Amino acid sequence: MLIIETLPLLRQHIRRLRLEGKRIALVPTMGNLHDGHMKLVDEAQDRADVVVASIFVNPMQFDRPDDLARYPRTLQEDCEKLNKRKVDIIFTPSPDQIYPQGTEGQTYVEVPGLSTMLEGASRPGHFRGVSTIVSKLFNLVQPDIACFGEKDFQQLQLIRKMVADMGYDIEIVGVPIVRAKDGLALSSRNGYLTAEQRKIAPGLYKVMSELGEKLQAGERDLEEMIAIAGQELNEKGFRPDDIQIRDADTLFELTDASKRVVILMSAWLGQARLIDNKIIELS
């Protein structure tokens, strides 16, 4: 396993792999790795000869400085986990390597519409930061495929559109959400939960699942269904942030033609902002 911190060294190894005809997979992460990330690695290994995992806490996608400052950084433990998974290359650049002139004057990539709706509306600049760093990593690693978790559903859709619009010859693989036994979606931010909050946290998935059952049963008063779900979250101890029911293919509001629906939920529990989603196939 190679640990690479600089762009020139990464380019050198990528050139060698390309000359050898290797199929390269990229797994972009911000570190603090858990079983959900390992699922991405497993998927990448099944589909490629070489796996490159990046660990970079991207300052450009944080809308609050305090959130960036407290984001968990566990590089040594992350490298140990990736080594056990036999990842070929770990790319761990510093912010100075990625943004040598800082983020303010950085050329950026922005996906219109998807960057500013839903999650993007409440986190200005977040998705611009995501699309910019992912585009940079694509240019540096030159992967044949890249694996992303479906937990960040809007992010996945945004990256797919960026790849299509920019003409990247990269297969984007969405990997299903990995959940704890009680249903809580695995997330690096779950570490912000206290022991008591961790007991409450699966309630988000429970409320979302009940909402999905109503949709499958034919209920269509979305405004009332969302209001009830928000009330249920409040009663469980959450502070609801956003609940949306959207077309899973476009992320726009439902139409009569919508066949795949995604429920998108976010809620605060103490200092942790939890997000989750569920795909519903309508008959």
Swiss-Prot record:
Residues of the signal peptide: none
Binding of ATP, residues: 30-37, 149-152, 178, 186-189
EC number(s) stated in the UniProt entry for this protein: 6.3.2.1
Residues reported to bind (R)-pantoate: 61, 155
SUPFAM superfamilies documented for this protein: Nucleotidylyl transferase
GO CC terms, sorted: cytosol
Pfam families found in the cross-reference section: Pantoate_ligase (PF02569)
UniProt KW keywords: ATP-binding, Cytoplasm, Ligase, Nucleotide-binding, Pantothenate biosynthesis
Pathway the protein contributes to: Cofactor biosynthesis; (R)-pantothenate biosynthesis; (R)-pantothenate from (R)-pantoate and beta-alanine: step 1/1
One example of a Gene Ontology biological process annotation: pantothenate biosynthetic process
Chief place where the protein resides: cytoplasm
GO MF terms, alphabetically ordered: ATP binding; pantoate-beta-alanine ligase activity
Gene3D superfamilies, A to Z: HUPs, Pantoate-beta-alanine ligase, C-terminal domain
Active site: 37 (proton donor)
Disulfide links within the chain: none
InterPro entries reported in the protein's UniProt record: Pantoate_ligase, Pantoate_ligase_C, Rossmann-like_a/b/a_fold
Catalytic activity: (R)-pantoate + beta-alanine + ATP = (R)-pantothenate + AMP + diphosphate + H(+)
The protein's role, per its UniProt record: Catalyzes the condensation of pantoate with beta-alanine in an ATP-dependent reaction via a pantoyl-adenylate intermediate.
Subunit structure comment from the entry: Homodimer.
Classification via PANTHER family: CYTIDYLATE KINASE/PANTOATE-BETA-ALANINE LIGASE, PANTOATE--BETA-ALANINE LIGASE
Anything else known: The reaction proceeds by a bi uni uni bi ping pong mechanism.
NCBIfam families: panC (TIGR00018)
UniProt-recorded name of the protein: Pantothenate synthetase
